[in-house]
């Protein structure tokens, strides 16, 4: 099953376990958020929204908040000794799609446990 969601003015085709970068969304790292603007639900019987599918949401886990690559806006007016250089970086949220939900269901998957490096075994040294 797949879904087409809209967030930040852009549309994304997602399936469970997809990892995608979207514009900044409020939410703590490791928390589960719900994306409510589902435009299409695909599968055996596709459902098209008008404009959105009623009762459908997509659950996603927030993996990270970061900044995108720097975009340089350079303007020069020839023969006028005038120029302007500005830089800009987008705020990005990295999401992992956990579930695609229909009919107003709630997410059943909680946040995943963080992986930690195992401490070296003291018994092995003996």
UniProtKB/Swiss-Prot annotation:
GO terms for molecular function: rRNA binding; structural constituent of ribosome. GO terms for biological process: translation. It comes from the Bacteria. The keyword S-adenosyl-L-methionine does not apply. Pfam families: Ribosomal_L21p. Keywords: Ribonucleoprotein, Ribosomal protein, RNA-binding, rRNA-binding. This is Large ribosomal subunit protein bL21. It comes from Rhodopseudomonas palustris (strain ATCC BAA-98 / CGA009).
